[in-house]
Design a protein with these regions (language model features):
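Accessory "access/gating" subregions that flank catalytic or transport cores
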Residues: 161, 171-274, 280-283, 287, ...
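Alpha-helical support elements that line or immediately flank enzyme active sites
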Residues: 19-32, 244-255, 300-308
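Functionally critical mobile loop/hinge segments
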Residues: 303-403
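Acidic, glycine-rich active-site loops and adjacent beta-strand->loop/helix elements
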Residues: 8, 43-49, 76-78, 265-274, ...
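Non-transmembrane, aqueous-exposed alpha-helical and coiled segments at domain scale
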Residues: 2-12, 23-45, 53-54, 68, ...
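Contiguous, well-ordered alpha-helical segments that form the cores/surfaces of helical PPI scaffolds
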Residues: 216, 220, 241-251, 266-273, ...
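Conserved phosphate/anionic-ligand binding catalytic regions in large, soluble enzymes, centered on
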Residues: 8-28, 227-246, 288-296
Length: 403
């Protein structure tokens, strides 16, 4: 299993798979072909279906146009075998003859793959010897350790500096989102709500105030993402509001130190990495259950650890966070990371805290394991038609009328 750094990537929204990934690929290909007279980029499947709404073409053109003209070709009905988010880069000479071509896939969370296994250009080093939560939890119990200590054992020495930086960016994204008002970009003309929710929540009694504040923090980050602001994938841009909202709320309301938050992030990253290794965090591959569902599991695990949960209680908390998002479709209206994505982040953040509380009332024993739910999520995602996997051809996206 790869480093948790691959789960937490700092970048700009609105989509890790549709903007961050393609822009990174475009930069690599452009650097290889500085002598090209022009470029063609063919976008396939989900990348083509919702690329306009996600600003995929703009992200690619920003990188390639300074070197040579680029033509974007959209093929939403063509799905390459390896992954729904396929793209082909072609470098052309002055006579428009191909100099080179490169097929690459944006596999979720800003990560790229050539689909070549261990010989892949983007193959990352495996840093963890164990790939299932069952085995990791057994290690923790045998050694009297928590999940963050397992991460500490195998990550590089700079992991805490990295996570503290991630936490700083998360805090800034909350603050920026709360400070901004107005309308989000795109044809939906969706008003920002975070600032209003924060003000209203502050006027309620503590029992309701807590929930309202969590809503406002999640909305703040998700709205920053939708407007192209700087956020952290956790595990993706589309689900980037859940973990920061939960941790920021606990940081403010319970005075947890930055160091304890970093340890909670390590635990969250471990759970996210397990899903990425054994299933997927790509909405184009498994639907929103792989994005918001996984984010809820990560936030549940992190919060349960902060409140002193045992390894089994933390596992139970994360299991519920993911289990109760099984089957969730990815059907963004107009291909934008706005409806229903932003509200889903807010609801998942409060659900994460509910799962943590539920798990803390018991000893962590339960029948369905986290690993089992991950496997079910993978199978469910593969069973879902492409209509419900980031193509905007079904569900809410199909039924919504801009008028």
């Amino acid at each position: 299993m790869e480093s948790i750094k691959e789960i937490f990537r700092i970048g700009k929204g609105p989509s890790s798979s549709h903007t961050m990934g393609p822009q990174k690929a475009a930069k690599i290909f452009t650097e290889r072909h500085q002598d090209a007279s022009s470029f063609q980029v063919i976008l396939y499947g989900s990348l083509a279906a919702t690329g306009k709404g996600h600003m995929t073409d703009i992200a690619i053109e920003e990188v390639m146009r300074p070197t040579a003209p680029v033509e974007i070709i959209w093929q939403p009905q063509t799905f390459l075998p390896f992954h729904p988010n396929g793209m082909k880069f072609i470098a052309l000479d002055i006579d428009e003859n191909p100099l080179d071509e490169w097929t690459v896939y944006s596999i979720g969370g800003g990560a790229l793959s050539e689909g070549k296994g261990i010989s892949d250009y983007f193959a990352t080093q495996e840093v963890y010897p164990l790939n299932s939560l069952h085995d990791i939890m057994r290690w923790c119990n045998n050694n009297g350790c928590s999940y963050w200590e397992y991460a500490k054992k195998y990550e590089d020495n700079d992991i805490w500096d990295y996570l503290l930086n991630v936490w700083e960016v998360m805090k800034q994204s909350v603050k920026a989102g709360l400070a901004h008002e107005g309308v989000l970009p795109g044809p939906l003309h969706l008003p920002r709500k975070a600032a209003t929710y924060y003000v209203k929540a502050s006027g309620y009694k503590p029992s309701l105030q807590s929930r309202g504040l969590v809503y406002s923090y999640a909305l703040a980050v998700s709205e920053e993402n939708a407007s192209g602001g700087t956020i952290v994938t956790a595990p993706t841009c589309g689900a980037c509001g859940v973990v920061p909202a939960v941790l920021y709320h606990l940081y403010k309301s319970h005075n947890f130190s930055n160091e304890r938050i970093a340890r909670a992030l390590a635990t969250a990253g471990l759970f996210g990495s397990i899903v990425k290794k054994n299933a997927s965090i790509s909405g184009a591959e498994v639907g929103c259950q792989g994005e918001v569902g996984v984010a809820c599991a990560m936030a549940s695990a992190a919060s349960c650890q902060l409140f002193g949960g045992s390894p089994s209680q933390i596992e139970y908390s994360a299991e519920m966070g993911l289990e109760h998002h099984l089957g969730m479709t990815c059907d963004p209206v107009c291909g934008l990371v706005q409806i229903p994505c932003i509200e889903r982040n807010a609801f998942a953040a409060t659900r994460a805290l509910d799962a943590q509380l539920y798990a803390s009332f018991g000893d962590g024993s339960h029948r369905v394991s986290f690993d089992r739910v991950v496997n079910v999520m993978k199978q469910t995602g593969h069973d879902l038609p492409s209509l419900y996997k980031e193509t905007s051809e079904g569900g809410l996206a199909k039924g919504y009328n801009l008028e």
